[in-house]
Swiss-Prot record:
Pathway: tRNA modification; tRNA-queuosine biosynthesis
Catalytic reaction(s) noted: 7-aminomethyl-7-carbaguanosine(34) in tRNA + S-adenosyl-L-methionine = epoxyqueuosine(34) in tRNA + adenine + L-methionine + 2 H(+)
Protein's name according to its UniProt entry: S-adenosylmethionine:tRNA ribosyltransferase-isomerase
Subunit structure: Monomer.
GO cellular component, one term: cytoplasm
InterPro entries found in the cross-reference section: QueA, QueA_dom1, QueA_dom2, QueA_sf
Gene label: queA
Native organism: Acinetobacter baumannii (strain SDF)
Length: 351
């Protein structure tokens, strides 16, 4: 399967660079189990879900992971904190005119807080901070909004690039689980009143989510690693949901990857799991847990577009995207949403 199979043309003006005034006011394109698409508003999910269905949400919180700073020579640098193995050590991306070497001292924030580059961890720099990292990020950092916004983070992003249900103890993502940004408290309350249940997984989104696929044959692509947790409480609710014939609805590709990673770790069984995942879902993948997916519109040739193409199929997804472009849906993190049903497989009866 070739990378070019997942290409499409997107006019620049359809990229949403700011959020709508109301989270749930976005549009929704429903791609059903027969591969047919239908136009809706996002709040129509109340009617598209059944009592007893289960929403699975990613409760991670985005950290202000981008720090501006300088070298001892005064040259500008930018640090993007990706992971924190402990409270004073971070694995980071560093933008600089020349790549810093082990032992280099850098300074971040208005108060010139010193940090030391200790070496490399895979493709990331190991950076030691002179004080706990999270307070430094909170005081001096910026939210690492996506590059396709073509702007710096603003005050509005502080609220709107976080989900309303994030767990403040789980602050470790460098990008939002953006499908969840459509949910506000009022919509969640209405779903609760209908009897739609909800539960949580955690996947801390890494900067690799924005990395392009660089291999023509997509099966040669190596996914970035992200930490996730699928707790037993969530598994119990999933098993109960499937036992009564209801649907498991993953909110976002991150929740999907967490759930399917747990299943893959147990040989296809539905079971709790915590660990690092590099799961790469593309057409041909057999989903173990997810029945339906709420997701945004994704970049051409991205691993996320490949994932959604595995749930329906590539032709259906690209046809839906073509309709979305013609009908002026908005794309990417602050854009509109899709509800994608797992494609029905027709089984022929032989007489």
């Amino acid at each position: 399967m070739q990378l070019s199979d997942f290409s499409f043309e997107l006019p620049d003006e359809l990229i949403a660079r700011y959020p709508l005034e109301t989270r749930s006011a976005s549009r929704l394109l429903h791609l059903d189990a027969k591969g047919q698409y239908h136009d809706h508003m996002f709040t129509d999910i109340i009617d598209l879900f059944e009592e007893g269905d289960l929403l699975v949400l990613n409760d991670t919180k985005v950290m202000k992971a981008r720090l501006k700073g300088k070298r001892t020579t005064g040259g500008a640098i930018e640090i993007l904190v990706e992971r924190m193995p402990n409270h004073t050590t971070a694995y980071c991306h560093i933008k600089a005119s020349n790549s810093p070497k082990a032992g280099a001292e850098l300074f971040v924030g208005a108060d010139n807080i010193p940090v030391i580059v200790r070496g490399r961890h895979e493709n990331l720099f190991v950076v030691e901070f002179s004080q706990p990292i999270l307070p430094v990020l909170e005081q001096y950092g910026q939210l690492p909004i996506p590059p396709y916004f073509n702007r710096e983070a603003e005050e509005i992003d502080t609220e709107r690039y976080q989900t309303v249900f994030h767990n403040p103890e789980k602050i470790a993502s460098v990008a939002a689980p953006t499908a969840s940004l459509h949910f506000d408290e009022e919509l969640l309350a209405k779903l609760d009143q209908k009897g739609v249940k909800k539960t949580f997984v955690t996947l801390h989104v890494g900067a690799g989510t924005f990395m392009p696929v660089r291999t023509d044959d997509i099966t040669n692509h190596v996914m970035h690693s992200e930490w996730c947790d699928v707790p037993q409480e969530t598994i119990d609710l999933i098993l109960a949901t499937k036992a009564r014939g209801n649907k498991v609805i993953a909110v976002g590709t991150t929740a999907t990857r967490a759930l399917e990673s747990a299943a893959q770790a147990h040989g296809g069984k539905i079971a709790a799991w915590t660990g690092d995942t590099q799961i790469f879902i593309y057409p041909g993948y057999e989903f173990c847990i997810v029945d339906r997916l709420i997701t945004n519109f994704h970049l051409p040739e991205s691993t996320l577009l490949m994932l959604v193409s595995a749930l329906s199929n590539r032709e259906n997804i690209l046809a839906a995207y073509e309709h979305a472009v013609k009908d002026r849906y908005h794309f990417f993190s602050y854009g509109d949403a899709m509800l994608i049903d797992k494609l029905e497989v027709l089984k022929l009866k032989l007489g």
